[in-house]
Amino acid sequence: MPRIGAHIHVADPLAEAIAMGADAVQFFLGDPQGWKGPVIPGGDASVIKAAYAAADMDIYIHAPYVINVATSNNRIRIPSRKLLDQQLQAAASIGAKGLIVHGGHVNAGVDFGEGLENWRKAVERIERPLPMLIENTAGGDGAMARSLDAIGQLWEAVSEAAGDAGESVGFCLDTCHANSAGIDLADAVDRVKAITGRIDLVHCNNSRDPFGSGRDRHANIASGTIDPALLLGVVRSAGATAICETPEESGGLAADVSWLKQQLLFRTGWRA
């Protein structure tokens, strides 16, 4: 059975993840909207690594949202590349299984191919001591990882640049983003794997918005516009660790983790 976890915002992600019965956890190493370098919780990477290993808890780190290595704007692309490198090294130091980064976008009027070339350069120049997992996005003109066609072009560019049969570059499938981008979740896993050959992580999120909306607003599994059975089907088909990035209020995040684990264990249908 794949591991099921949650994105945790509190100061002690390990304790919170254990309390909700998760066996994987995702968190930020610093401000997700800022350009400052990563911060190791407690300041000692070896202590963090040992604690999570002792608890048999897999770690995934989400890179800051500001990173956009695809852009032609030097004032964003260059610091993005630097911050991505810092995040990769920091994530590796605490024993993370992967670093998730959004595909980014090119500005209006800029050729999509320029974004692909910027991604190639980033992958070629950045040391990757752990897998860098590119995540699909919900909307935006010039998005590098919104449509399946765009994902295909981006994957070809980065896997070729990686030069290691793609082992240091992977893919994270976000269900809310896919639904908002107009990708049918009923066969999304098969269609993505036909492009990438792999799905390394699933962000199992429902959506507050309708199919094809282009909006990125997560909802708890039982309360969004996506049939929970479709979300469960994605997790089962992908066979990868699933992380819930859903609202925490009123115990919703913990309930999502619990429901997913129960459904995967007992293979029953949705029960409201």
Model regions and ranges:
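Acidic (Asp/Glu)-rich catalytic clusters
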Residues: 15-22, 40-60, 85-95, 123-129, ...
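Short, electropositive alpha-helical surface patch
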Residues: 75-88, 111-124, 148-157, 189-193, ...
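N-terminal pre-domain/capping segments
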Residues: 1-63, 67-86, 270-272
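Active-site acidic/histidine proton-transfer and metal-coordination neighborhood
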Residues: 53-54, 69-171, 180
